[in-house]
Amino acid sequence: MSWGIAWPWNRRIVPHSSACGERRWRVESVGVAVVRKMDKREIAKILEEIGLLLELKGENPFKSNAYYNAARTIESLTDDVTELIASGRIRDLKGIGLALAEKLAELVGTGRLTYYEELKQSLPPGLLEMTAIPGMGPKKIRAVWEKLGITTMGELEYACVENRLVSLPGFGQKTQDKIRQGIRQLKRRRGFHLYANVIGEAERIVEVIRHSAEVRSAELVGELRRRLEVVQTISVLVSADRPQSVLEGLRQMGGLWELARAGDRIIGKSPLGIPVAVVVSEDMSAHVLLTATGSEEHLSELAARAARMKIPWNLTSDLGVKLAPKADSEEALYAALGLPFIEPELREGLGEIEAAETGLLKPLVEAWHIQGIFHNHTTYSDGSASLDDMVVAAKSLGYRYIGISDHSQSAFYANGLKEDRVREQHAAIDGLRKRTSGIAIFKGIEADILPDGMMDYPDEVLARFDFVIGSVHSRFNLPEEEQTARVIRALVNPYVTMLGHPTGRLLLSREGYRIDMKRVIDAAKQSDKVIEINANPHRLDLDWRLCRYAKEQGVKVSINPDAHATDGLEDVAFGVNVARKGGLEASEVVNTLGPDDILPALSAPHH
């Protein structure tokens, strides 16, 4: 007779006697066929992760400790663990009960463990990754997840930047600083680094080399000279007769480690563990500088152009110049190919040579072109500096206006402003305007774009602001069509001035949400809206590749620091890098306008 019940494949019912002599039945595990022989460390790691996942879920500590103890037991085994599991003898070990033995049997018998996979699926995947951060145990991870909605390492790092952890119970400033430092350490181990985390150290190394004996000149080259947002190596080109003198100078600098020399090359690691590659050349010729800067794609296109023009051209990637036109500068090298000088930031092999050939390359925007800055937070929401301090800092940097834009009411995690606090802040700005000269102060808001594309204030509230930045801060996982429609609907709102951090990405940490940015840029053109280049070095969003499309469509950008402290105002320089890589001129960046011209240019309906 069949009852329609599938009995587990690795269990059987056997008779046994109870303590009082009664005949009863019990379930026992039987031997299993091994699908894949597993190392004890593999099995222990899975058990350890199950313990972590249970802690992250807030399960009974006894339950998670059982898995931790089992992991330690298995890792200490000298016998073949797979054989012990397959034979059922694993139950002889202390702490391995029937339920756990059955899970281990499933693991080696099928190559997977349903319980483990279901546990992982029940939690955001980024939570487990965060356990690798020093100082971030399961309790703290659970706290930032439940209190701040943080589910990835990138979001956690950005929350540290925004100073949002200090107010959580059990955290504080020191803990926040330690967490941020730990995240950086993890990223370094993975081999990629934010430009902003590298450039300061790289410039110090170059300065030390320049002051070394016998050195004529030294320049950053490669990814850093091209100002890529993410880099792997600090590459330096040095003009000197003896590589040994350069090596000695680096040794005297201190902090560099694993320094070694092979011929004209010196390698090592910076104090932060970033690979350093120094090439010493007797003469830093234009040919060598061009080649060391790259990119490979750009150099390849130059070589192809030279071949078509029948010009001798054979620059090698190992910096051994075999054949090239005579030139005393990079400008002269490009001129030999009938081209104007191409700025290093543009040399990515993405159409810059064709643009130069047809006269489309214009002078790029410079940091000094920026007249004022939008997207600045204060202590009214999640900033760490007061309104007064942010204005004073912006003025000291030479800006002629600053736009204050704290978070809106939906951003509860960031102390977003309800309508009464909007009125309170506006009154404070009015008072500050009266006692401040030399800088204009604009009233703004970073308003959440709700999932349906509506803004989280009614129009009568939005009308009170000088500018409105619309940003997505929730529901990142919407399908592409829905996310795109959501953002486009926000751009149609007559009170929205610009789109903030348009893809939501966090470099090296979180991919942007699925969105058709070309359609969004087209919509910005139709509604005459500005798109932000968020200059925070963790974002740099709009990406420079998309800046090129915005340029083609005639859509202007605003380079905004997204500052949450006074030092964050200085991030504008990183946004300028993005704009330059995107080929943007000063006239294509809206905040190169002065204070009298900027608000009309933002097309707000009440100006």
Stretches with model-predicted labels:
Residues 403-404, 445-446:
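Core AdoMet radical
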Residues 37, 61-266, 273-275, 286-287, ...:
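Accessory alpha-helical DNA-binding modules that contact the DNA backbone or grooves
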Residues 3, 7-9, 25:
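Tryptophan (W) side chains
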Residues 14:
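Conserved HRD-motif arginine in the catalytic loop of eukaryotic-like protein kinases
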Residues 25-37:
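Short, Lys/Arg-enriched N-terminal segments with co-localized hydrophobic residues
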Residues 36, 227-378, 386-402, 409-439, ...:
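Charged catalytic cores and adjacent phosphate/nucleic-acid-binding surfaces used
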